[in-house]
Amino acid sequence: MGLKQLVLQLVYGHKSSSEQYVSWLRSQGMHIGQHVHLYTPWSIKIDTQRPWMIEIGDNVHITADCSILQHDYSWAVMQHLTGEVLGSCGMVRIGNNVFIGQKSLILKGAEIGDNTIIGAGSVVTGHLEGNAVYAGVPAKKISSLDVYVDKRRNLQLEEATLLVR
């Protein structure tokens, strides 16, 4: 183990690398597929209060400062008024081959279909069909994945010239 990894391990523990964080989440009972990568894992917050309520598929990429929640604490306001704890929770399902952009928030009850891109800073609620690109607050469909692939192909040469200047 190199010096950098040793420092990360001492400072961030199980969040010091993508592999360690994924392994730890699995040990808590979370279902996580193969080839899942957490970029800057120490900045990613994945709710482990009920780990069985979050499912992450294969080939999922979650970037820095993202949060995935399967519950909330809004009941605290109602408890103050009524004395009742009216908790709220919901499954979170992230399909296969999904990219979640930086600083996105995946809320309880969210379901992200296969082959989906979530733009940076998005708030995901409810069901998002697969083979699509979503962004915004709340996340809305921007385009089909096929249209986005064609757009990226068309821009590839133009953007490549920026790299060689």
Regions found by a protein language model. Give the residues of each.
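Beta-rich strand-turn-strand
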Residues: 102-126
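Short acidic capping loops at alpha-helix termini that bridge into adjacent secondary structure
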Residues: 34, 96, 114-115, 130
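Flexible, glycine/small-residue-enriched loop-and-beta-strand segment within the central core
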Residues: 37-111, 137-138, 144-146
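Short-chain dehydrogenase/reductase
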Residues: 117, 133-135
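Terminal amphipathic alpha-helical/low-complexity segments used for targeting or macromolecular assembly
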Residues: 1-35, 52, 59, 73-77, ...
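Short arginine-rich
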Residues: 127-131, 158-159
